[in-house]
Amino acid sequence: MKLLLAAILTASFALAQAPTTVLHIINVKWKADATPEQIKAAVDAAHQLPSKFPGIKRVWTKNIKYQAQEGYKQAIVMEFESEAALKKYADSPAQKWWYDIYMPIREESHTHDITN
């Protein structure tokens, strides 16, 4: 019984710990003349970033429900290992590579960085 209680308490404690990763959330308004192929290339390139920058753990781009200002059609979420990794990503070769694809078709964006 003591072992079962210890296991339950350990599992509960592990679940209660807040994550230390950082979510970098980008809400994008594409330029009016951006083609579907260009948008797909930018989104696909975002998915390649974890292989180009080790501090990025995951990337999400599939919108299930999206409530935003008029013209904003895309959310891109990048999960970074830490705030330090997010800061290191800024101006990195990986970010510059992605910006070469993303920035020419981006009209504007709003970014939020969130952690616990």
List the model feature ranges, each with a label.
Residues 21-29, 61-90:
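Short, well-ordered beta-strand segments in beta-rich or mixed alpha/beta enzyme
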